[in-house]
A protein has these predicted regions:
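Beta-alpha junction/loop-to-helix N-cap segments that form part of ligand/metal-binding clefts
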Residues: 67-72, 89-159, 169, 225-232, ...
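Segments of small-molecule ligand-sensing domains
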Residues: 324-339, 350-412, 427
Length: 430
């Protein structure tokens, strides 16, 4: 089934959306005929024939990362709805041009090229899997398109592979590791890391291993999990030895499989278990049930009203998400970090376009300059909190929340301010 035919996408609007209901008409040559009609943009009445900004949104809507890609796209759509409802950007509406990268780098590169050449987008906001983001960065650069990333965490995006055209307005693994390592060492001195065998998992493994060692701990072993492994038992059953902590770095269906099978093997009771927050995102919780109990994680966003997340603007944004998704997702899950980061990324892009007087690709350099060192504050557009897009590498830093799963809910143990997670820039723009 194509992503456009799935229930979650029914209430979204994107360029080229078709009403697939069949309309009947009469013809002298043929009897009743079926037809499909383009769904008009919801902003047409307000903006008339004003030329919209075309913003590309490349996400994994099928394949291994599809569940996360859907949440990411919902975050972008939520921001675009609010932008258009409040007058657009520079008096022009925003039109989303959505493409599915199928969770594969080669497909992502082809779709990025299509967005750049066929669809002629003005800017791009999206990207979920790090290997896809890395594969597409040269496309955006070659066509002079600003790329505001929504999810990808691989450190190379803003370090050794950085680009003047790409921005990451949220955290990355080195910042997470700096924030979490002191707590991990209190839980256990010796750790075994289980990680997804692709760029994000590998780089996150390295970041946490380095920080654990720097704080006097030790990583005594690692277990590599190929993406899409349905039965991890043969791999997990080999885990043993002298260590006290089990650390997981997985996402999507693999995160669910890991948590369930590690629990069933007794690993999560034998060892203190912790991990990257993607294991315990809200969409995973219904399937994990009680088996996620006691998990300690770190994330930039949690769907709770605690600590600095207990604000009127977070509650308002949370309610807007629930209202937007309740028709297509009965028993709606709460928003997660993928919704949050794409929502805020689109708002970063909006502010940059407004401040630069951006009209289209010819103004890309002006847009880049407006985004560099752009500082934003917590509010309706940035419910997660304050942050700044650093000029030197186009990297932002965010507050980090260390949490424990109790009775199926995230409970914040401590908040680490973004200022305590800052890493020195390691980027040299070409």
């Amino acid at each position: 089934m194509q992503w456009q035919d799935q229930a979650w996408s029914k209430d979204l609007w994107y360029s080229g959306k078709v009403d697939r209901r069949r309309f009947l008409g009469l013809s002298a040559a043929a009897g009743a005929v079926g037809a499909s009609m383009l769904v008009p943009p919801p902003w047409r009445d307000a903006f008339g024939q004003t030329r919209p900004y075309k913003i590309g949104a490349l996400q994994p809507l099928t394949g291994a990362a599809a569940s996360g890609g859907r949440m990411a796209l919902i975050g972008t759509e939520l921001a675009v709805r609010r932008i258009n409802a409040s007058g657009g950007i520079n008096g022009r509406p925003v039109e989303l041009v959505v493409e599915d990268d199928q969770s594969m780098p080669d497909a992502g590169r082809r779709k990025a090229e299509k967005l750049a050449t066929t669809d002629r987008i003005d800017a791009h906001q999206g990207g979920w899997l790090s290997d896809v983001c890395l594969a597409c960065m040269k496309v955006w650069e070659n066509h002079g398109i600003v790329n505001m990333i929504g999810v990808c965490l691989d450190p190379r995006i803003t370090t050794t592979r950085c680009s003047r055209y790409s921005f990451r307005p949220f955290d990355y693994a080195p910042a997470q590791a700096v924030a979490f390592a002191p707590s991990l060492i209190k839980m256990a001195k010796r750790w075994h890391i289980v990680y997804a065998d692709y760029t994000w998992g590998q780089s996150t493994r390295d970041s946490f291993a380095n920080e654990i060692k720097w704080h006097g701990g030790e990583v005594v072993g690692t277990t590599t999990i190929p993406v899409g492994t349905a039965d991890m038992t043969p791999l997990l059953s080999k885990i043993g030895g002298r260590f006290e902590g089990l650390f997981g770095i997985l996402y999507g269906a693999d995160a669910i499989t890991f948590a369930i099978q590690a629990h069933d093997l007794g690993l999560t009771r034998k060892y203190r278990w912790a991990g990257e927050g993607s294991i315990a995102i809200s969409m995973n919780l219904p399937r994990l049930g009680a088996k996620i109990e006691g998990f300690v994680g770190i994330d930039r966003y949690l769907p709770v009203f605690e600590s600095t997340l207990d604000t009127p603007y977070h509650r308002k944004w949370f309610a807007e998400f629930i209202e937007m998704t309740k028709k297509s997702a009965p028993g709606t899950v709460a928003p997660d970090r993928y919704v949050q980061s794409n929502y805020e990324a689109m708002n970063f892009l909006r502010i940059g376009m407004q401040r630069s007087g951006f009209r289209g690709r010819a103004d890309t350099q002006k847009l880049i300059e407006a985004l560099e060192d752009l500082e934003v504050h917590a509010g309706d557009d940035f419910p997660q909190g304050d942050k700044k897009l650093r000029k030197e590498d186009h990297q932002a830093f965010t507050d980090q929340f260390i949490f424990e799963m109790r009775s199926g809910r995230h409970r914040i143990l401590t908040r680490v301010p973004w200022s305590e997670t800052v890493q020195p820039p390691a980027c040299r723009f070409a």
